[in-house]
Amino acid sequence: MKNFTTLFTAILMTFAVTVFANDDTKVYEGSVVLENGETLVGQIEMLSPTLNEVKVKFIASNGKATTYKASEVSAYSFAFPKYDASTKSYIDQTIEYVKKDVTVAPIPFGPKSVLIERQVAGTVNLYNFYAETRSAEHAFEHNYFVEKDNQMVEMNRENFKTILKDMVADYPELQVKVGTKGYGYKYVAQTIQEYNQYTAPKGAFLGMND
């Protein structure tokens, strides 16, 4: 289970970068939910890890393309084909972006009310967040945001132990494991998933997007 979760986390963390590894346009079946509640069904064109957070390019069934700013959208999602080595076939994985207020703009002088990818949903939500850098080696920096009780907190390799221990304090058996083997930074999705399963109402299943 740990190996699977680690692989799943790695896929989601690298998705936004690897999907732009070449110049081919990446278009996927999906939908956009506008701020007025209207849902548009069609295709979503990927732009870049950071531009996907500040706007979304939607293509209607008639081929007309419209770019919506984050201020106009509450959420969007699309089906991303993930290769399953066990079946040697592709399985659609739902990628979901929702609007949240963050502390850092993804692009210079950009908005801080943006659309970010929700990787884990439940009592604690986990979001992947990308921001542009000035580094010649890495164009984008990846961090997380975690959310509990509608409070968004930025989380990185340096502060994850403090933040997660506080968020899972009502599950002491898990709290003491944070930062230990199998519960390090690369396992934050698994740790949050375990906590969400512990706190979920009986019979409910809250977890990673699939």
Locate the predicted segments by residue.
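Short, solvent-exposed mixed-charge patches
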Residues: 22, 208-210
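Short boundary/loop segments of OB/S1/cold-shock single-stranded nucleic-acid-binding domains
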Residues: 25-34
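Bacterial Sec-dependent N-terminal signal peptides
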Residues: 1-26
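C-terminal partner/receptor-binding element of secreted or periplasmic proteins
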Residues: 173-207
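Aromatic-patch recognition
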Residues: 33-35, 40-174
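Exposed beta-strand and adjacent loop surfaces of beta-rich binding modules
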Residues: 16, 29, 53-55
